[in-house]
Swiss-Prot record:
This is tRNA(Met) cytidine acetate ligase. Its main location: cytoplasm. It comes from Bacillus cereus (strain 03BB102). ATP binds at G81, N142, R167. It is found in: Cytoplasm. Belongs to the TmcAL family. It catalyses: cytidine(34) in elongator tRNA(Met) + acetate + ATP = N(4)-acetylcytidine(34) in elongator tRNA(Met) + AMP + diphosphate.
Length: 393
């Protein structure tokens, strides 16, 4: 955050944040409302939600949804982390793919026919068409997402400029603490769910406000969220489904339904299920997203109705600082998408999916807390934060 503000000299900072489930196909550690508080306390001025129909998708769709929201908010500059760290290389790579599109698509198909996952096939295709000196390494996850941000900016004819900050010390998938002050999200999540875990081990790797809110959430609700807590619901659902039922679920294709129904029979945990399910063709993240859609019963028809090839249909405002509120007041007449301060009365196919996802997310809570949280989510107004006093209003 500090580096972003230093690099962009921004007047205000806006964060587009996933809701209950994340792009890598797993539940968020804590609710979006607690994460909104974390963002505001760390210097963000506006927090808006990326709908489930975009947030639990491959990088291209995820980026397209996020950029469309930022465009609607008239953002002038975007900043993202990457393994490469040179923004020119991202533009070079997008240009190279466009110029070699026919060759690129042929190579992707060729590598997929050889049994590779789409992500691996794409990475190999890029290696064949790109010069390594002026282009990014498309095998790295943050580079992939950054590439899609630039592609979305250009495809949406946006005037938005882009900057990138190089990741260092810790890589995306690192599961151990390799540095005294920097750790990957994967590593932090693993630590939080390890045996005899405590917040002490991660305090030096995350902002003080984040650590405090994580501890508060666990104290108030008795849990942090991960896939294992949903496994019994997930397994029960699969036990009641036929291959035909599964084929209607989004991202279930090419015979995957039979493999899923076979492997769930002998799996006693989500991790063991994933270990049994994964193949060279399907990445762990790709499979986790498919499992998320099974858990939330998100069908191909629902995603089709959500029209994810277009821009996000609304802006769900989750939180704002005083400065953020001023920005919205000054620019609200220019913002063409509806801004939702709650979802109780708004109706849209994308929001139907969102409501299901929220319901599933809170399903691990005990009653009556579960019902209270779900009802509160629909009527919850944006969190307000006074940055001068560092207090929530």
């Amino acid at each position: 955050m500090q580096q972003t503000k230093k690099l962009t000299h921004s007047d205000i900072t806006i964060a587009v944040m996933s809701g209950p489930f994340l792009q890598r196909g797993e539940p968020a550690l804590v609710s979006k409302w607690y994460r909104t508080k974390m963002a505001l306390a760390c210097g963000v001025d506006l927090v808006v939600e990326l709908p489930y129909a975009f947030s639990t998708q491959k990088a291209e769709t995820f980026a397209n949804g996020a950029i469309s929201i930022l465009n609607a908010l008239h953002v002038s500059e975007i900043c993202f982390g990457s393994e490469d760290g040179q923004i020119e290389n991202f533009y070079n790579t997008v240009s190279a793919q466009k110029n070699e599109e026919e060759t690129f698509n042929r190579l992707v198909k060729q590598f997929m026919n050889a049994g590779n996952s789409y992500a691996k096939a794409t990475s190999e295709a890029f290696l064949h068409i790109l010069s390594s000196e002026k282009n990014i390494d498309m095998s790295q996850p943050n580079n992939i997402l950054g590439f899609q941000y630039i592609k979305a900016i250009l495809m949406q004819n946006s005037s938005m400029q882009a900057q990138t900050i190089k990741r260092f010390a810790s890589h995306y998938h690192d599961e151990t603490f390799n540095d005294q002050h920097i750790a990957s999200a994967t590593c932090i999540r693993k630590q939080l769910f390890s045996e005899n875990s405590s917040f002490t081990e991660i305090e030096s790797f995350i902002p003080k406000a984040t650590a405090s809110l994580l501890a508060s959430y666990k104290q108030n609700y008795g849990t942090l969220h991960n896939w294992e807590q949903y496994f019994s619901f997930f397994k029960y659902k699969l036990m009641t489904m036929s291959p035909e039922d599964l084929r209607h679920i989004y991202e279930i294709e090419e015979g995957l339904e039979h493999r899923i129904l076979s492997k769930i029979q002998t799996s006693s945990s989500f991790h063991l299920f994933m270990e049994a399910l994964k193949t060279k063709r399907y990445t762990w993240t790709r499979l986790q997203r498919a499992c998320t859609h099974i858990l939330t019963n998100t069908t191909k028809e629902e995603i089709h109705c959500a029209n994810i090839e277009q821009h996000a249909p609304y802006i769900r405002l989750l939180g704002m600082s005083q400065k953020g509120q001023t920005y919205l007041s000054k620019n609200k007449k220019k913002i063409e998408l509806p801004i939702l301060t709650h979802t109780k009365t708004f109706d849209h196919p994308t929001l139907h999916i969102e409501r299901k996802a929220n319901s599933v997310y809170f399903s691990i809570m005990k009653e009556p807390l579960r019902t209270q949280l779900l009802k509160r989510d629909a009527t919850h107004h944006p969190i307000r934060y006074d940055e001068t006093t560092a207090k929530f209003l």
